[in-house]
Amino acid sequence: MRLFVGLGNPGAKYARNRHNIGFMALDRIAEDHGFGPWRVKFQGQIAEGRLGREKVLLLKPETFMNRSGQSVGEAMRFYKLDSTDITVLHDELDLAPGKVKVKAGGGHAGHNGLRSIHDHIGAAYDRVRLGIGHPGRKEAVAGYVLHDFARADEDWLEDVLRGVSEGAPHLAAGDGARFMNSVALRTAPPRPSTGTGRPPAKTPARAEEPPAPAASPAPATAPLPDARSPLQKLVDRFK
């Protein structure tokens, strides 16, 4: 069994916040893959279903971000899971908007939700880091993550959520490379070779030049006058 945890804050007030992209990802997975209805358990909302051959539990902690580990730890102990059976999907300031990366273990990089999970289950769980970008100044971070996504973000956000959902069966199977390929097909689709873009500029054809005129034959050289004496001419005839 796999446990997928999406991080966020509960309530309509926070539903479209950047900090809640983990919740959004789980909602899309549940909808696209026919998971059961959400219900309250483990201090959060859970939904059960299958991704490929794997049984998967989706968990959205409702303890608020800074206490997410309480909910995750409770679910892990109930199902007797190892931390390596858990994948956490969360917002990532250090990735550009629309970028996604998978990571096994490691530090929490100051993310309060991850910090809480570290405290309750250790650091060996997997993560899916969903890039939201950085506001540029440390003091602006809190307001930035607790603000709704801008309208200009909607296109890339939709692509990311679709890619994560389509790749979720690979994620459940532990195949991070194929999961990332599914995401890439949505966030950076290959361009067809016969696309409608502007064709490359053609080199203009050079006008044909008329053939060079044939060289005229050299004029015949006029014979030189015979300067021999009559006697010499006679001698030369009998040589």
UniProtKB/Swiss-Prot annotation:
Disulfide-bonded cysteines: none
Catalytic residues of the enzyme: H19
UniProt site positions, description: Discriminates between blocked and unblocked aminoacyl-tRNA: N9
Reactions listed under catalytic activity: an N-acyl-L-alpha-aminoacyl-tRNA + H2O = an N-acyl-L-amino acid + a tRNA + H(+)
EC number of the protein: 3.1.1.29
Region (Disordered): 186-239
GO molecular function: peptidyl-tRNA hydrolase activity; tRNA binding
The keyword NAD appears for this protein: no
Pfam families: Pept_tRNA_hydro (PF01195)
Sequence ranges of Pro residues compositional bias: 210-222
Gene Ontology annotations for the cellular component aspect, listed alphabetically: cytoplasm
Enzyme kind, highest EC tier: hydrolase
Location relative to the cell: Cytoplasm
Site (Stabilizes the basic form of H active site to accept a proton): D91
Chief location: cytoplasm
Keywords, sorted A to Z: Cytoplasm, Hydrolase, RNA-binding, tRNA-binding
Gene Ontology annotations of biological process type: protein quality control for misfolded or incompletely synthesized proteins; rescue of stalled ribosome
Low complexity: bias regions: 193-204
Residues that bind tRNA: Y14, F64, N66, N112
Function summary: Hydrolyzes ribosome-free peptidyl-tRNAs (with 1 or more amino acids incorporated), which drop off the ribosome during protein synthesis, or as a result of ribosome stalling.
Family stated for the protein in its record: Belongs to the PTH family.
Subunit structure: Monomer.
NCBIfam families: pth (TIGR00447)
Protein name: Peptidyl-tRNA hydrolase
Taxonomic classification: Bacteria, Pseudomonadati, Pseudomonadota, Alphaproteobacteria, Rhodobacterales
